[in-house]
């Protein structure tokens, strides 16, 4: 199997010009778990899709002969495929003597994350130094969040779950606008939804699998520690050109025209994602099987309104007091002096100078 995968890797790199670089910093064996497909045995496109498997996470390991986990990959019988994938991946990992990196893409990332949890719960769990995981385009960190945990989707024979936490170092790679890993929070924004659906074709799969972490902006990389004590590094990979308009580029529409369309459409697309919301934005969004609003934003809006009302309420007595003081001072002063002040205000500086000049004339 290693020899076959290695040959495919060489062929793919020769055609695509992808360069493998080491992200591990030390020698380790790589185990690759591909994503879902349908009718694998009779699908005429499957052999072409399989040619891309060697590129899965190619910039996250330096193994020249990665092992490929073979399982059903059946998207229409997901739970069974996932169980089979975990069992087969574990057998591959158990045979490796030394450090290993398990890299899963799409459905393969679900297999990898469940394997990590299973190994951590085993009687003799591997050391943190001996194994790490890379999850590329994980749907359980994306579209699955539309639904509550435990929701059963009959069409896919899949029960919704989240990415399980483990003590092992885990890298997550998410491509912007990828429907499976980065769907809009407001799917009723049809332009945003259509863009994400196109992202399933133009971002998901080989494009995101070939991500080089060195090219991801530092601001788009976060590091956290989960409840199991594992370090989780997340790379959010920007998509410079909207997937929604990629078809026009492919059919030969000049980039200048499509770029202009992108500039018009991107704010509409981004309005479907909470990450672009401004403070105080209370627009609804879909999460965990229900419609929610930004409670913090609502509270900020309420606090701001209350502060404005309080300020006005506090200013009103002050204004009234200043007015009363002014009236009282006017009443205490001689009437003639008040008249003079009023005259000075009406006539302005010139009248004051004229008055001064008149007082200096000899009597």
How does the language model describe each region?
Residues 13-19:
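Hydrophobic core
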Residues 2-9, 20-106, 110-363:
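Composition-driven, intrinsically disordered low-complexity tracts enriched in small residues
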């Amino acid at each position: 199997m290693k020899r076959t995968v290695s040959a495919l890797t060489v062929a793919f790199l020769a055609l695509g010009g992808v360069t493998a670089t080491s992200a591990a910093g030390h020698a380790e064996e790589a185990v690759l778990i591909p994503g879902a497909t349908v009718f694998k045995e009779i699908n005429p496109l499957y052999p072409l899709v399989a040619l891309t498997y060697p590129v899965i996470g190619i910039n996250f390991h330096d193994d020249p002969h990665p092992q490929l986990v073979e399982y059903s990959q059946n998207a229409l019988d997901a739970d069974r495929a996932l169980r089979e994938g975990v069992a087969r991946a574990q057998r591959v990992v158990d045979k490796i003597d030394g450090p290993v990196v398990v890299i899963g893409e799409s459905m393969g990332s679900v297999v990898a994350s469940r394997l990590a949890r299973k190994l951590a719960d085993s009687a003799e769990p591997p050391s943190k130094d001996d194994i790490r995981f890379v999850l590329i385009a994980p749907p359980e960190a994306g579209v699955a969040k539309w639904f509550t945990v435990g929701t059963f989707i009959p069409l896919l024979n899949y029960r919704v779950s989240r990415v399980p936490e483990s003590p092992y170092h885990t890298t997550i790679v998410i491509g912007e606008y990828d429907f499976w890993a980065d769907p809009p929070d407001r799917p009723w924004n049809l332009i945003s939804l259509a863009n994400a659906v196109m992202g399933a074709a133009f971002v998901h799969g080989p494009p995101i699998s070939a991500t080089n972490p060195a090219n991801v902006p530092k601001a788009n990389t976060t590091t956290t520690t989960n409840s199991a004590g594992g370090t989780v590094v997340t790379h959010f990979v920007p998509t410079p050109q909207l997937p929604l308009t990629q078809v026009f580029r492919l059919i030969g529409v000049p980039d200048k025209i499509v770029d202009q369309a992108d500039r018009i459409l991107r704010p509409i697309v981004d309005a479907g994602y909470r990450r672009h919301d401004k403070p105080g934005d209370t627009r609804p969004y879909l999460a965990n099987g229900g419609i929610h609003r930004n409670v913090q934003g609502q509270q900020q809006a309420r606090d701001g309104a209350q502060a404005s009302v309080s300020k006005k309420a506090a200013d009103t007595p002050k204004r009234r007091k200043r007015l009363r003081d002014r009236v009282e001072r006017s009443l205490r002063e001689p009437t003639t002096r008040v008249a003079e002040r009023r005259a000075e205000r009406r006539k302005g500086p010139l009248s004051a100078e004229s008055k001064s000049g008149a007082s200096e004339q000899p009597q």
